[in-house]
Regions:
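Non-catalytic accessory/interaction domains
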Residues: 2-206
Length: 206
């Protein structure tokens, strides 16, 4: 950055000039990164499957967003692994046991929950010690509703089950915003009526 400022201290330079300077300093080709991360819009959908981590470009352009993600998975205890994603499929033998797909919020994209993580969070969401992890869990479940991997009714039942014990106001407020969107947009009238009484008691207790 100092070289960049010295070189163009009295003239105009664009972003590409900075990228070229970084390339010469780092000895790496940054053009692909520059195109995907800076010049183009969009974000990947990232799913964890038995054979690994699948990155999908919903625009159909088959783009890949190189990045590293912090994955929490459960095999004889909760474990954390930092995984570099460099292709549309990244092998990961514990993909089906993932609990939090982007636990430290290092990644970029839509991270969908697995069937295992949905069952795990149903039981253990409130027991996650770090409020960041609980926030990540709610975000993943919300994304699951948007992508039809989690039923809206199930999300609301999780809110009724776990949110009354939540002490972090940021987690509560953000999750309640998810609840409002799901209730008004992703539930039909019959589903709303079925959960209405439980939801009213929940709102009173909150």
């Amino acid at each position: 950055l100092q070289r960049y400022l010295r070189r163009w201290s009295y003239s105009n330079a664009d972003w590409d000039e900075l990228i070229k300077l970084l390339e010469s300093t780092m000895g790496q080709d940054l053009q692909a990164w520059n195109e995907i991360w800076i010049k183009e819009s969009g974000a990947p959908v990232i799913e964890f499957q038995k054979n690994g981590i699948v990155m999908t470009d919903e625009s159909g352009k088959n783009r890949v967003w190189p990045q590293a993600v912090s994955v929490f998975w459960d095999y004889m205890g909760l474990k954390r692994t930092l995984i570099p994603l460099r292709d549309s499929l990244t092998p990961f033998r514990y993909g089906a046991a993932v609990v939090l797909p982007d636990g430290d919020v290092m990644g970029y994209g839509c991270f969908l929950p697995t069937d295992f993580s949905i069952r795990f969070l149903d039981d253990e969401l409130g027991n996650l010690n770090d409020p960041l992890y609980r926030a990540v869990a709610w975000q993943a479940l919300y994304e699951g509703v948007l992508h039809k991997k989690v039923k809206g009714e199930f999300f609301l039942k999780l809110c009724i089950k776990h949110l009354p014990q939540e002490k972090n106001n940021l987690v509560v407020n953000r999750t309640l915003s998810f609840l409002r969107i799901i209730y008004s947009t992703y539930l039909d009238e019959g589903s709303r009526q079925l959960i209405q009484d439980d939801l009213e008691r929940f709102c009173i207790n909150m």
